[in-house]
């Protein structure tokens, strides 16, 4: 069918299209080359104020336009590099690192700064909590560690003070004897007061003790029984042995603690000594705290703050105590009602927790192992990243501190302005508030007065509606329950049928499983046959390509006619550098006209060549037809090729093993040589000399075909034959390793071709070769159409014969007979397709 890209003439299509893939490759190569050769560092000072940054950028662009309007005198060297497209100015102004991207870079920098601020301020609550935890983690750990480190020295200091007091107790007693007369007088006076006041009290207690004596005797009897029970256990039998064992083990424990106490004491003394040396560092903050505390106490006691605080504390304490009394009373009342439900809740929660204990234990074990391993693996990573984190923190701290210092005055001015505006607005609104409150009060009173008489009536009406709806519930329930009761017997009648269906399906499973296995085996055989047929089809196409060699030779003459035109183009391009200077002054006027002429010339050229291309295509098609009929000695290619297609599948099985086996052997030998070279450290380039990536790909395809054949043989071996399956699996592993070696070498060669030779290719030669690809594309399209006419592609005779696949038609009387016939057919087909192993 004709379209915008071609014109159909009979059965031959002529298509003229640009080689965009080659253009993209050239463009990518040029851009990469420019990046390697030309680079510039553009300092960008990002202003946090977006408006200021835009204004600076506009001012810079105006200066650039002014300088550009004055004009410049650019010296052009005639001996330019032909491989570089565009001059220095074009690369400077239009390249990726040129001045033309300065505005984009500045805009991007401003956008990134704004995005950083938004991202920093838009953190979620959880993120801020995480940031806070991270921020206080290190100081908190350091504070705790410092306190723990200073604790031994503080304990030593207090212990030393207590020891000194104990040692000087005799002196303290001797000094206290001077106050003994006064102390004795005070004791006598106080004792007299107690004696006078407590004598009646103790007389009453004497009578009480007389009354309580029998009860106290009962308590003493209980205590005696407790002591007897304890003594009976520890003085005889297992109890005595256990007590002896406890004492022995305790003695051993104390004996073993000797080195521990020695080492611990030494460490404690060392730490205490270091702390004592650092006591001087603590005096200054303690003195400062004491002075500040004294000043604070003087202030709050003199200005009435302390008295007000005590009054507020008394009020708060009174409220708390009253609330405690009320809560206790209400709690006791609630406990009397909630005893049973709370007991049920506690028992249920306990049962649930006990049932969940195995699962919770497993989860805890999982989390412990995973998190522990994660921490162990992350520790060296964090250690390696610590210098980077430290540098980043210092850099961010410096940057943020500078930014905040710069923003502080600005924000202060903004806050003062907003404060003044808000104060003025609130002062203006303040006189209006009493009027608004009075208006709302009058409105509410009016609403209550107007709607008050009707609210009880509305409530009564709603109550009647709810009562009527509730009365419908018994009717609905009495109607639905019999209906459900009627459905239950019908549903129950379905249960036996469902049980029979399940039982029947269970009985069918032993029969269905072998059938499914048969289907899987058939699918594997079809896939194997399809892969083999595809390999044969490639060989047939290669033979047909030989028939088309004459056609390609004719096209080669046409390609040769282009060489003189390409040489002229190359000579003309060589003269271009000398003309650049004269053209550059008036570039703006002639570029548009030149572009129009180029496009119009391309259109005219394509139009003038259409008729010639059609004539040439007819001539080539006639040559192809005559070459085929002359080569085969026939006059009806369709009939002969139809017969060839009928016998292709029959001859394929005979020639497959002989034609395909050498390719496999060559691929294996090449992979073995490459493996030896890689193991010995020898450069494999000498082994791959003369071998292209296409040939390596063909070798990989041959090895893949061999792997599939061995896989089919392995699947045919019973699982009980472990030795045979292991031997075939070893062959499969070896073929996989050989394929990996060939794939690696193919990728290496391809990368060398792409990245080593790309920089040295002449773009003009590539453009000329792209133009010369047109006749080759024409030949490919003609050959593909010719194959379609022969019935080899699409819905042709040979393709139909190939895609028919393999069918099994059985005339059987039992499933066992079908399985036996299927096994015999598969064995025959495997021998005819892949040969004997």
Curated annotation (Swiss-Prot):
Q: Which domain of life is it from?
A: Viruses
Q: Where are the transmembrane segments?
A: none
Q: Which InterPro entries match?
A: ARM-like, ARM-type_fold
Q: Which PANTHER family match?
A: FELS-2 PROPHAGE PROTEIN
Q: What is this protein called?
A: Minor tail protein Gp26
Provide the organism lineage as a comma list.
Viruses, Duplodnaviria, Heunggongvirae, Uroviricota, Caudoviricetes
